[in-house]
Amino acid sequence: MIEYGAEFPSVVQTAHKENNTVPIYAFVPKDRKDKVPVILILHYWGARDIKAERSMADRLAERGIGSVIVTLPYHLGRTPPGYRSGQLAIQPSSEQLRATMSQAALDVKRAIDFVEGRPEFDSAKIGIAGTSLGALVAALVYGVDSRPRLAAFILGGVDLAEIMWSSSLVVEARDALRRRGYSYERLQLELTEVEPLTYLHSRKESSAFVIGGKYDTIIPRSSTTGLIGAFDNPRTLWLETGHYGGIFIQSRVFKEVANYFETEFSGKPYLPPRRIYAPTLRIGVQAAYPTGFDIGVGIDLWKSNDRGDLVVVGLLTPRGPQVFFGGRVSQGLSLGVSGSTTRVGFGLFWSRVL
């Protein structure tokens, strides 16, 4: 695979000069004989490197498909001094959220301009793929720009206001919005111009591949199903994980993304697998009588349904391995029995699926 970098000025100029230049990284199959299809790859929020995106680029190159990784606003080399990568991308202000999403979409559109001018890429076969925040931006771009023919959304969704109002990752920003008098309805109204659903009706008949996490608390499941519902015939794949558990099957997921683009660009319909095995991993705290408090990491051994109304979890705790069996009380909270080879307790188990 041949790799080269480039950069261009952002369409939007901000108060932070580092954020005003867009680095991109292009990857071309080494043995290409003609122009190749190309995928714009967008990374997740807070990315500190592009290792995952390079892995996707490798998978695509194996299928004779090129790719271009686009650095999103306030991330990686666009991060101003004194801030973490992505820290300024999501702020408790509808005005700032609109500005960042608009800048991201315009930067990706300019990256598509770049692709169209390169002799190694086939401008008639452009796709877009994003993970998490990258999937949100990809959905917006797919709605406002007709040049990408195909799109893959990994752990993404729609309804930005719902994500801000429900995600377990933006608690501080959500609390700040509430202190400023925001409601979900007000935020939804003020984000209309950067909401993917505002524009995706134009792509209702277009191809799309949506990969969601059944137990995702960062991108709410309702947001992912909303994205699925924006298309007439989307390809879908639900992982038995939360937002982070997919890292354990990243290679398999990227393989399916590459399968999707290769198949659909060839003019054939892509059929996703019914499921990809992924362990459902949890971190949790239990309070049981008479055994007391414990923290642990665990794996689901059995559950009665997708909601986990009844669940058996194998746990590794500082006191040794344990098994918890219980029933769901509310989101993330179960009541039941936990035990090891030497003791048994009855109580509560709070957990979050990774």
Label the model's feature ranges.
Residues 45-105:
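Cap/lid segment of the alpha/beta-hydrolase catalytic domain
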Residues 227, 293-306, 312-315, 319-338, ...:
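Feature captures outer-membrane beta-barrel proteins of Gram-negative bacteria and organelles
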Residues 35-44:
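Short beta-strand element of the alpha/beta-hydrolase
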Residues 88-129:
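Gly/Ser-rich "nucleophile elbow"/oxyanion-hole loop immediately N-terminal to the catalytic nucleophile
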Residues 1-31:
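N-terminal cap/lid segment of alpha/beta-hydrolase-fold proteins
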Residues 242-254:
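Catalytic histidine-centered segment of alpha/beta-hydrolase-like enzymes
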Residues 137-183, 238, 248:
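Hydrolase active-site cap/lid region
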Residues 203-204, 209-212:
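Short beta-strand/loop motif that positions the catalytic acidic residue
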